[in-house]
Structure formats: structure tokens, C-alpha cells
Amino acid sequence: MPTSMPNDPCPCGRPADYARCCGPYHAGAAAPDAETLMRARYSAHVRRDAAYLLASWHPSTRPGELSLDEGGRTTWLGLTVQRTLETGPETAEVVFLARYRIGGGSAVRMTEHSRFVRDAGRWYYLDAR
């Protein structure tokens, strides 16, 4: 997994360094809301942190294992949060656009509508459509 220096900009796009943005969540702190969790999960994809991605995935939909781009061919280019919606006291949805490139290919834009649930005080990724 790539490492981030404490003063490196956070991959999630917020104007903070990694150590004060997504770093604490990757180290085990609970995200305060669904958007923050989604941003931390994006940063985990950038860092190829499968352990965090699995830990932040709700047990009811979590896969047994997760295969990321181990060859390092995917370059994540940026994240834009388009909409965050609290759908209930313990549920939320986040729509975002992620940009990436595989190898020397053209940049790709991916839009995802993710659902999140709060369980025992922690937010988890549930699924996407």
C-alpha cells in the first residue's frame, strides 16, 4: 500500500493534509458522517488499502475478500462529491464522480450513488447503484 507523509495533501480532495483528514479514519477512528466515510474510502482506494475498505463495509453486504489494483496500473485523478442526502436517522446516500486512468489509457469518469448505514454508532458503506 502506498504511504502518505503527514503533510501530503489528502487524496479525498478536502483542503487538508492526509494526517488531519482521512489518516485518522484509516487508523480506526469513526467517520462522523457518510460523506466523510465515502471520502476516506476513496482515499483508501488511492492508497490500495483493502483492509480499510473491508472494515468500513457493512457486514451484511461485505465481500469475503477484495482484490484491488495490485499491479499499480490504476491512477486515481480526483473526486467530486455531487450530492449528500440523509435519508433517515441512520441512513444516508452520497453521489460522487471519481476520475481515474488505467495504465497509459484515457481518463475515465465513474459516477456512483452509494448508500451508507450507521450501525452501533459507526457509519458503514452498504452498497451502490
Curated annotation (Swiss-Prot):
Belongs to the UPF0225 family. This is UPF0225 protein XOO0286. It comes from Xanthomonas oryzae pv. oryzae (strain KACC10331 / KXO85).
